[in-house]
């Protein structure tokens, strides 16, 4: 036996995506959670092109892979602009920053945020202490920010809702409504990329009913339990609820004894139906009164997902599905309302 024959043959090189047929490679990538797309887009220019391609979305739709993702906007100490994060699914359960950041401009104060499929709309708000008519949009399919045409009127924290794919916006003025009724409300049509006025007196019943049931509070969540709309909110660090109608008494959510030591600060809708997420902070590593100057402190943001069960007319019981630290800040962060907005994107 010769020396060459005695040597073992080297193992074959691993199969790469580039060696697969295009349709097979496309099908494989379509089955990967969108949460990993930002990382995949860093692999190569070819990956970035494919992730933004309509063919990938068409394949995902064909194989039935829509996903709900909870997105939160955090206000952090010493950061002039809030930062948007996407909440990773089980098992990681971590906040992952959205890249790129908000475009090079001041993030508005008190905007209204709504979602439509894979897109997040940042509507109005204060920019340099003045009401703004700007509308920015972030698309999770392409991971890009872009600016929409300006609204007809500057608005701060207006009522807004997505109806039949169009963005309806009402109010948000200083004091009472403007004397010009045509400017009190407007609607954005993505197909024409234009804003058009709407008359409040001419809104159909569907639009009116949607706005009556709409809630615009970052510290509250609204969901349907046993076919009844319920409003949940945080008060004094605890979770409370009431039916979403006038005259119904507010009551504490039972079953959360294991979380009694945690002071909840925010409640948000979860990506799944019939559940909410509650958020709170903890500070460690010798956090003293002057830690804001020394920064010898660590702040942790925690989240728990709670499923809810209605028991009779007067009791709502919560069940903790999981509870976990989701984000760490290497300093003290005393901002109380650290979640300024949240939405759920579906795509």
Swiss-Prot record:
The keyword Oxidoreductase does not apply. It comes from Arabidopsis thaliana (Mouse-ear cress). SUPFAM superfamilies: Kelch motif (SSF117281). It comes from the Eukaryota. Transmembrane segments: none annotated. Residues 1-21 are annotated as: Disordered. Keywords: Kelch repeat, Repeat. CDD domains: F-box_AtAFR-like (cd22152). The keyword Repeat applies. Kelch repeats lie at residues 119-165, 167-215. SMART domains: Kelch (SM00612). Residues 14-62 form the F-box domain. This is F-box/kelch-repeat protein At5g03020. It holds the Pfam family Kelch_FKB95. InterPro entries: F-box/kelch-repeat_ARATH, F-box_dom, Kelch-typ_b-propeller, Kelch_1.
